[in-house]
Every structure is written in C-alpha cells, then in structure tokens.
From Swiss-Prot:
GO molecular function: peptidase activator activity; toxin activity
Application of this enzyme or protein: Used for quantification of normal prothrombin (CA-1 method).
Keyword Disulfide bond appears in the UniProt entry: yes
Name of this protein: Snaclec carinactivase-1 regulatory subunit 17 kDa chain
UniProtKB keywords: Blood coagulation cascade activating toxin, Calcium, Cell adhesion impairing toxin, Disulfide bond, Hemostasis impairing toxin, Prothrombin activator, Secreted, Toxin
SS bond partners: 2-13
Length: 30
C-alpha cells in the first residue's frame, strides 16, 4: 500500500513530480 497521492508499480511506490527526471536521478533524489 502506498501513501495517498502515490502510485504503486511492481511493489514500489512512486510519485509523479512536476519536474521531469530520469529514473536513475529520481532514485537518487528519493
């Protein structure tokens, strides 16, 4: 289960931010 506003994909939670990021950068950002 993910927090409200977050989406789940393959067991991971993620959130779409206004700024675009590559997946690698997003992982480091988190």
């Amino acid at each position: 289960d993910c927090l409200p506003g977050w989406s789940s994909h393959e067991g991971h939670c993620y959130k779409v931010f206004n700024q675009e990021m590559y997946w690698a950068d997003a992982e480091k950002f988190c």
